[in-house]
């Protein structure tokens, strides 16, 4: 996905574009070897949010594209775009929110043991702008959820990690840091084992300020 445009003076940055979905190849079926099975394409990464104009808020990051499904290996979900940086001047603008990670592709094969794709990671929160009173850091994006297991005892994939919180702005009074979001959740089919949860997002740091709150694990 494309990056969002920068905001005019005092304006907010544009939201980044969503990443394209991964391709879905034809399922060849059968019990052929792993190397002959089709592989789904990875989802595109979301675009970064634009930088806010003077005093303006940074744009939010775009979401990652979904991973493509296939008969054997699935494409991974795209990563969320990073939040845009807040504009400087007067009171610094707040950082944009990180884009959400996309879910991994799901297994579709019934002829062999499938492997799941991983969910995309959440984009990092944008940094706050400097000057006057620092703006608050943006929160990290939400992690993508791992793809579901296939019909024949597939191992479920791990979920994506939560995006880290943005950094608080400097100057005058320091802004508060952003908070990390929770990791994604793995959900398998009845005959599949669940994958591990995504890691919790880390809170952002402020210059000479307190640290942000960590997200909860999935």
Predicted regions and their residues:
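Glycine-centric low-complexity repeats
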Residues: 1-218
